[in-house]
Amino acid sequence: MKPKTTYIAAAVGIGIIVLAIFYMYSADQAKNRGKIFGDNLQTIQDELKQIQVEFYSKKTMLEERTMTQEEFAEFSKIHIEKMKQILAKYDALLPPESFAKSVELFKLSTQKQLESDQYLMQWIATNDTSDKIRSDSLFQESFEDEMAALESYNKAKNSAGQN
């Protein structure tokens, strides 16, 4: 082999090695970004669950008369702010494209849950049955959106795992 051909072959070999390293690095980075996204989404969902458990616990306390309506109204203001903070956290997520739909559905579910809670608070304050009916309806829609979000998330996760 001529020296020039040897240099070209060596350069091509080095180029292939560099591309392989870059590909592996990119794949690792994508996997890391996916894990970070999944962890952040799980944290948001856990916070949301805790906020809702606390809200319904306070509602039970009100029903059992261990909390006054005024105390519940004050707590409700804090609850609404916490729910708005959760919604903002969805906006801050940077989901991989395949997970964008599930994040939209999780956020929509949370928005409907917030609306449901607000109608429930209104019903408690006014005893207007239409507020309770609207709250229940939004609660059901929120649940359905949550199930759709979970299904979408699992489909995207399974597709990503097969690649």
For each of these PLM feature ranges, what is it?
Residues 1-7:
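Short, low-complexity patches enriched in S/T/P/G
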Residues 5, 21-23, 97, 104:
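Intrinsically disordered, low-complexity segments enriched in small/polar residues
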Residues 7-23:
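Hydrophobic membrane-insertion alpha-helices, especially the h-region
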Residues 18-39:
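Transmembrane signal-anchor/signal-peptide helices with a preference for the extracytoplasmic
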Residues 36-163:
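Alpha-helical segments in soluble extracytoplasmic regions
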